[in-house]
A protein has these predicted regions:
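C-terminal domain-tail junction helix/linker
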Residues: 135-180
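Active-site beta-loop-alpha junctions of metal-dependent nucleic acid enzymes
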Residues: 38-39, 56-80
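Generic enzyme active-site microenvironment
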Residues: 30, 46, 87
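Mobile-element integrase/transposase regions
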Residues: 1-43
Length: 180
């Protein structure tokens, strides 16, 4: 067994519906942590696969209870049609995936160990976040306001993959009545 896989009964990425891969239907997310200085601090990242819309999640700690509760809080703010699935790596912070699914109705799928290419949207977005917060950043010293500003800048940045629309415009166009 892989020593990095403390996840009990993971649902593997191979079991995701085909629509997740095609990105035709919004509501499928990729999640991760961006670790700070000495791996002691972190922020959570949630990226919607179709629109590339980003939610940066401030974290006081990176244990599974803290991460689950913080991610649940963010998913509760979303309309039901944007809460279809979450694809994650095998980090211990998602050990409470069954509780997360029970509380949010969002099914969690796990990438294969050591396979970051299975979550390309999230890996790319984490790279963009590193433009603002390079490796060695102590996220405990970064305010929620600063995180929100970076989130907004990235969500307002036009993306080639979205035909030079921004993630915010793309998600807003899809859900005109929803307040993000």
């Amino acid at each position: 067994a892989d020593k990095r896989t403390p996840i009990k009964a993971p649902i593997r990425i191979d079991e995701r519906p085909a629509e997740v891969l095609t990105r035709e239907i919004p509501g499928h997310w990729e999640g991760d942590l961006v670790l700070g200085k000495n791996r002691e601090s972190a922020i959570g990242t949630l990226v919607e696969r179709t629109t590339r819309f980003l939610i940066i999640v401030p974290l006081k700690k990176k244990d599974s209870t803290t991460v689950r509760k913080a991610f649940e809080s963010e998913f509760r703010k979303l309309p039901d049609n944007l809460k279809l699935s979450l694809t994650y790596d095998n980090g211990t912070e998602m050990a409470q995936h069954k509780t997360f699914t029970k509380n949010t109705k969002v099914k969690v799928y796990f990438a294969h160990p050591y396979s970051p290419w299975e979550r390309p949207t999230n890996e790319n977005t984490n790279g963009l976040i590193r433009d603002y917060f390079p490796k060695g950043t102590d996220f405990n010293l970064i305010s929620k306001k600063q995180l929100k500003e970076v989130q907004n800048q990235l969500n307002e940045r036009p993306r080639k993959t979205l035909e030079y629309e921004s993630p915010l415009n793309t998600i807003s166009r899809l859900y005109m009545n929803q307040n993000f």
